[in-house]
Design a protein with these regions (language model features):
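Active-site/ligand-binding loops adjacent to catalytic centers
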Residues: 2-69, 84, 106
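Phosphate-binding loop/pocket of nucleotide- and phosphate-handling active sites
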Residues: 35, 79-106
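Ser/Thr-glycine-rich phosphate-binding loops at phosphate-binding pockets of nucleotides
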Residues: 70-74, 91
Length: 106
């Protein structure tokens, strides 16, 4: 299998995929990330809504992983990407935040 690099961005602010910047609730990703990512090294971009990211975050918390909203977005993007592109493949993602920072969002 070839390694694929997949970026995740908010549906409400899909700047990396050519859309307009907008307000969203996924802290740590979004319009400013475009300048931190070399898009030539990104194979695909998954767009995840704030609502879906929060929902997946809450499901992860229910399993004992106290993570934040961007981790919910990363997990959901990973699940959707593998389902759409390589159901027998292997995905590695990063849970880059802790949920303690986002207790008011839960």
């Amino acid at each position: 299998h070839k390694i694929q690099t997949v970026a995740v961005e908010p549906a409400e602010s899909p700047v990396m995929s050519g859309g307009e910047a907008g307000l969203h609730g996924i802290q740590g990703i979004g319009d400013g990330s475009k300048f931190l990512v070399d898009l030539k090294k990104v194979d695909d971009i998954m767009v995840i809504s704030t609502e879906d990211a929060k929902s997946r975050m809450k499901q992860l918390i229910g399993t004992g992983l106290l993570v934040g909203i961007s981790s919910g977005a990363n997990v959901l993007a990973s699940e959707r990407w593998i389902e759409q592109n390589d159901p027998d493949g292997i995905v590695v993602t990063i849970l880059c935040d802790r949920g303690e920072r986002y207790l008011s969002c839960m």
